[in-house]
């Protein structure tokens, strides 16, 4: 017992010491969890603020449950801003001075933000807002303002892409008259300027406006032609706006309404009646990818709060709380979370305010740096600040219906509008669908795309000025009814304008106003008419108004609808070939010489061929030979060569030569006929410089700008004559300069085309063609009609419509195929017949070569026969192979015909002549009767029939016939 007591007395102090140490460590561990004060300034009575607070509390709870080892814990201090700027400022000041918060989450809108930003900058307390999105706040340039959301300016390119895709040319922004509404306007203007879209009017509506004031503003918009409205305001004012718009009939067919994310992101908190009033509206909404973090949060949210869906602001609030908790934990180990006791302003006078003794947070710079570098994958996408704000790269385009919203497409930076996005593990991929939106239900429950521009029924018509002309009325003609004095406007320019206006994507009422004096005379020049458009007296000018640089400073011209250029018209004269030697003109000198040389060449070749084939030809004298040969050659020109040729080579050559002559003579005949019958119209003046040097008179149209152009080119004013009509222009040409007329006219292509349609055979156009921009329709500077009208003019000029209008007014029933001078008939030269003459030459050479080869072969065959006849022969002749071998049918044993030399009857020839005659005579191959007679006389020659008929054995024709005769 004493031992136990002894041990107990010794161990008790140790147990007590252990227990005391445990309590100390336990207390120390409790003291290591640092409570960090964070303020929240929101409109707590607003639905959106209440939902955002739930998301913030849920974010901090889940974050610290997941990171229970963190040494810091955020303690939220919530203050109500009471929906006023003063209330927000007072709440922030209280949190900084009384609670010494190291950061403030808020405010709830952009109007309350400026004062809080300045307050945070002075106290080094970061102001973190996930709902103040106005770009105006960037101008404060405060490093202590962090925008945990997207800038409103990031959506303007998505809006401009929608406007551009439907080719609307004018829009009217309707925005809240405060910092939030005005902040986006400069960015909208820049975005629309890039796509040439005009902002016709800016409608600012105060959040405090009564329904009557809103209705008055909407009625004002109804009187304007623009039907595309972009609404940028918060849901409270937006709901009232659309309710009144539906009431007065602005949610019907033809209207286009596009809302920014100020309304589109908060449609989940808007009532069903508001959505019903917005049926057919397009919305640009912030897009969050369906990440696993977002889907897990939605599951937990439904379990905790029922079936309510998360909106964008709840997601941003959730990520904002997470980012702030991570940043505070990061700096907690080496930064004091308290406030400095040194005041910013140490003034002790009675004029000081609560701001004068405002202290500053020691953790401010480090916390700001930690927030700038924090990065994690949140429920709203990657949370990573760039220049103090989150960046948006994708927006969702929704079509608002009575039951909610329907996605019709997306907009992605650097890509544009797409129908859908396909999300996979590698990120967002653009679908292969066309860069257009899905079908949209527009206001009025229609699927047809509104034109975007309509003239109201109570709007006045456009006053279009038309010139009063004394001539060239085919372009514009003003006639008046004798009874009513009502003007009737017709002409080429009027038809083009009416056709283009009918094809416009919207209806434009207009009326023509003649630019004339009360007594019906022209009121002034075209420059004066254009200037009155500039002054606003007219809404446009239609007529044969030339587009000029000086006029374009006062008005905007649509694209030209007529041919451009200024040309010079001069008379033409007939210069047909005349004279006794005209028959030589069709062929050039070279071709005449080539043809004559070819005749000589053919004659020589015929001589060579006939000399070898015809014995009679060799017996003729040299003069007869030459005359016969060249008569034969030249007679082929008329195909009158009746004497048959003896040589096959001559016949082939003559056939080829006759073919060449046929082509040559036909071409000669056609050219000569053209020279004698077709007019060769030549201009009296070849070039514009000839007019300047000759000093002749030049005509121009009265009131035309060509007068100044001619003076600039150096022509004397005394030499310039005016005309009003094509007939007067023609009469001046007939007078010529010597009688006070003109020798040339300087005018635009359109007028010249009309003149040439009537007098095309008497005048022509000479070079050069001077530059001019053609006729165009004039409108006031910046008119939205110009781009659309220009597009319709292009459609007209590229199709058959313009041709039909020109045929109606400018060409009529008479068409000039060519307004230039007629070319004289082309003379035939040797280049056109080189191939034919080459063929003749090649064929003749081949025939000559063939003749030489045949002659050499005959000579060799003859030599072989002579040698065979002089050799010893067998006394008994063998019967031919085809003869019967019967003893009673033996062949006669007459000696071979070549072995007998029979003298023909008549005078004897001397030995030399006889030998020469025998060596040169041949059996005519084509005469088969002669050979048959020879065989019948001497049957022993049957076996020699082939030799006789093959032209290879020279025979002595006279000796053979002598033998036949004696037999």
Curated annotation (Swiss-Prot):
Tissue and organ distribution: Expressed predominantly in roots.
SMART domains: PBPe
Cellular localization per UniProt: Membrane
Membrane topology (Extracellular): 32-590, 673-832
Region annotation (Disordered) ranges: 864-913
Signal peptide (UniProt feature, chain positions): 1-31
Disulfide bonds: none
InterPro entries, sorted: ANF_lig-bd_rcpt, GABAb_receptor_plant_PBP1, Glu/Gly-bd, Ionotropic_Glu_rcpt, Iontro_rcpt_C, Iontropic_Glu_rcpt_pln, Peripla_BP_I
Key word Ion transport present: yes
Membrane topology recorded in Swiss-Prot or TrEMBL: Multi-pass membrane protein
Pfam families the record matches: ANF_receptor, Lig_chan, Lig_chan-Glu_bd
Gene Ontology BP term (one): calcium ion transport
Cytoplasmic topology ranges: 612-621, 643-651, 854-967
TM spans (from-to): 591-611, 622-642, 652-672, 833-853
Listed GO CC annotations: plasma membrane
CDD domains (alphabetical): GluR_Plant, PBP1_GABAb_receptor_plant
Key words, A-Z: Glycoprotein, Ion channel, Ion transport, Ligand-gated ion channel, Membrane, Receptor, Signal, Transmembrane, Transmembrane helix, Transport
A GO MF label: ligand-gated monoatomic ion channel activity
Residue ranges with Polar residues bias: 864-874
Glycan attachment points: 45, 57, 121, 336, 345, 424, 550, 795
Keyword Cell cycle: no
Family, per entry: Belongs to the glutamate-gated ion channel (TC 1.A.10.1) family.
Subunit description: May form heteromers.
Function: Glutamate-gated receptor that probably acts as a non-selective cation channel. May be involved in light-signal transduction and calcium homeostasis via the regulation of calcium influx into cells.
Identification of the protein by name: Glutamate receptor 2.6
Organism: Arabidopsis thaliana
